[in-house]
Amino acid sequence: MKTLHVIAAAAAATSLWVVAAESVGKLPPPWFISGDHATSYQAGIDNVETISGKGAKFLRYAQGEDKGFGSLVQVISAQRYLGQRVRFRAMIKTRDVSNWAGLWMQVQAQQRQNAAFYNSSDQPIKGTAAWQARSVTLDVPEDGTTISFGVINAGSGQVWIDQLSFEVVGKIVPVDVMPAARLPEKPVL
């Protein structure tokens, strides 16, 4: 009888492993991993942890020192958005994020590498959090060249994004701005 239980347990574990292996797919191009510790992260499509039913993109800390960050990124031409306000929205979920996670977007221009930037560090998602709606809104200047956007994971843990959208919005929608660093009032010598 014990032998039968052991065989049943082994079969169940094998079945779970097969289901887990089948639930993760490759990350579709043009998405890629970036960041100062990009090689410490893995990314793909998770068909289990999804709310759209189409699979959620994930970014998971896999190895290395628990320092720096990884980011799941897509870069597009700014050409069709010149002079407009754009918003990147997604549902986001985290598990065991050691530092913080959030959506981000950057606009580069001919004369300025960082024409506009926001990374959600002032509205961090930490630890384990259920699905929640987040967005980033920026203006694209007339000389814009590229728009980069995605999700950042600073530290260990895993983050998922699903139900993504990228759209032009009206000027009534406020732009996200990074908080200004407080500068000293006088020099420290």
Model-derived features: where do they sit?
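Positively charged n-region of N-terminal signal peptides that target proteins for export
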Residues: M1-H5
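Hydrophobic transmembrane signal anchors and adjacent membrane-proximal interface regions, especially
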Residues: V6-I7, G170
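Bacterial N-terminal signal peptides
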Residues: I7-W17
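Extracellular and organelle-lumenal recognition/adhesion modules and their flexible linkers in secreted
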Residues: L16-L189
